[in-house]
């Protein structure tokens, strides 16, 4: 390969990247893959033009922890990583290679978008830029598609990260947007900064388009390598095992972590760390919709996907964003044969005009649809409470969990005692003189309601499969997941659901 191709663009562009903490595309690949394993394709694309080495994109195959992967990396030192006709063709070919090898595909994105000068050749045709997104959709759920966003992903190019399974963004450098701040000011009169329009922090905490926010490119690459370790190479295969590790216990029993008073908050992460192998928690969308937790972990070395309400944030109530976050994660796990563990402490879905106008019913239906569609092994645990449609969204008994477990203090009902008593007995309560007499009457009604939804009664009616002490929960989960690892998938024959999106 000519040295000028390996060097990429002019030295001034390399210097500019270095000043902002950005690596050269080939350096990124070298850090991502196993040493000496990268085999490049079409390095001489557009080689007759000295200003366009490799036509601004590096593609090829490699190994990551011994596993074959495919890679596309924009070279921002060449025309800002923009796309020409051969750029697009190279991306299409590596997608087709990933399809044929059934290998994970990494997109290392740092691109200003389409070259306007090449638009007729690269934009509208059957092998034009749109085919990239078509291919991504066809590959979705077949092979892992991982985006590391190191710089801009502008205009139509923003759909590359959008169609990936996970998007890792580098703070301060990564951005994605359909229209730049300059275009927004020209077209709609909005003055906005790049960070406000499409920066990494915004997308990882507000829009949800980003999944993981990293400080440096090295951090992003390390996270992506770790993430791949939880996934099978392709759909239909089990995720890889790892040596089992004991949990990193806080020294507290789960019953001590979870307050008996359902109105007191606690950190569900403390419960998760009592259950999963030490160091195995890999959170996705940590900064977005923080009232629900989603991430991979291991129990006795086996991969599970965890969906857990987080009472520490907004009481664990489900909102539009949290329902969207959970639904996407559930679909990801189901696509790649990753068993699902639901940890419920949910008062229900949020109510009010604001969320109704945002589409809370639609979003809730989406989450419940994802729960209903999943055919991987799935276990739900009622940690403290599961009220109303929150029970449905957290894979309650009607949604065919392989087991529905509960801690001893758990409560399942249409609504909590306080809300239920006020809803049913409001008029009678008002007839009782305010003061100690009314307080005693309300307390009596609440006690009667609690007796009606007693956990042992639910277990007697086969609503709950087992009431498990906290110190036995990890072992119970490990045994049950092992039992259902080989279960048959049952799906009605159809093309797909009509999703409530």
Task: Spell out what each predicted region is.
Residues 1-501:
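Ligand-binding clefts of soluble mixed alpha/beta catalytic domains
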């Amino acid at each position: 390969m000519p040295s000028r191709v390996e060097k990429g663009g002019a030295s001034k562009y390399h210097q500019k990247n270095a000043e902002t903490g950005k690596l050269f595309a080939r350096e990124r690949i070298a850090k991502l893959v196993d040493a000496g394993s990268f085999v490049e394709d079409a390095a001489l694309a557009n080689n007759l033009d000295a200003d366009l080495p490799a036509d601004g994109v590096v593609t090829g195959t490699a190994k990551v922890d011994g596993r074959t992967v495919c890679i596309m990396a924009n070279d921002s030192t060449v025309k800002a990583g923009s796309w020409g006709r051969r750029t697009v063709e190279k991306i299409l070919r590596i997608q087709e290679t990933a399809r044929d090898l059934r290998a994970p595909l990494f997109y290392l994105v740092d691109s200003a978008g389409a070259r306007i000068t090449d638009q007729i050749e690269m934009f509208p045709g059957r092998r034009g830029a749109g085919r990239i997104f078509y291919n991504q959709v066809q590959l979705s759920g077949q092979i892992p598609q991982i985006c590391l966003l190191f710089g801009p992903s502008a205009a139509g190019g923003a759909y590359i990260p959008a169609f990936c399974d996970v998007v890792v963004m580098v703070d301060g450098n990564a951005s994605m947007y359909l229209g730049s701040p300059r275009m927004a000011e020209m077209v709609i009169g909005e003055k906005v900064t790049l960070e406000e329009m499409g920066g990494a922090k915004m997308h990882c905490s507000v829009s949800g388009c980003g999944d993981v926010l990293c400080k440096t490119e090295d951090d992003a690459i390390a996270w992506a390598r770790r993430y791949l370790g939880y996934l099978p190479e392709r759909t239909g295969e089990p995720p890889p095992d790892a040596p089992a590790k004991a949990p990193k216990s806080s020294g507290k029993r789960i019953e001590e972590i979870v307050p008996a008073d359902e109105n007191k908050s606690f950190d569900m992460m403390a419960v998760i760390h009592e259950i999963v192998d030490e160091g195995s928690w890999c959170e996705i969308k940590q900064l977005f919709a923080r009232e629900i937790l989603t991430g991979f972990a291991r129990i006795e070395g086996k991969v599970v996907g965890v969906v857990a309400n987080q009472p520490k944030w907004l009481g664990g109530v489900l909102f539009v964003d949290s329902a969207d976050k959970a639904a996407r994660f559930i679909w990801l796990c189901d696509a790649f044969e990753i068993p699902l563990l639901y940890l419920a402490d949910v008062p229900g879905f949020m109510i009010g005009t604001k969320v109704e106008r945002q589409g809370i019913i639609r979003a809730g239906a989406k989450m419940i649809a994802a729960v209903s569609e999943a055919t991987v092994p799935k276990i739900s645990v009622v940690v403290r409470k599961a009220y109303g449609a929150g029970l449905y969204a957290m894979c309650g008994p009607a949604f065919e969990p392989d087991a529905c477990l509960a801690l001893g203090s758990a409560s399942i009902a249409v609504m909590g005692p306080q809300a239920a008593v006020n809803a049913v007995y409001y008029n009678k309560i008002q007839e009782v003189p305010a003061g100690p007499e009314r307080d005693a009457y309300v307390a009596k009604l609440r006690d009667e309601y609690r007796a009606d939804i007693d956990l042992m009664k639910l277990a007697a009616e086969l609503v709950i499969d087992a009431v498990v002490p906290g110190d036995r929960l990890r072992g119970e989960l490990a045994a049950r997941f092992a039992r259902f690892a080989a279960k048959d998938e049952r799906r009605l024959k159809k093309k797909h659901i009509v999703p409530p999106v």
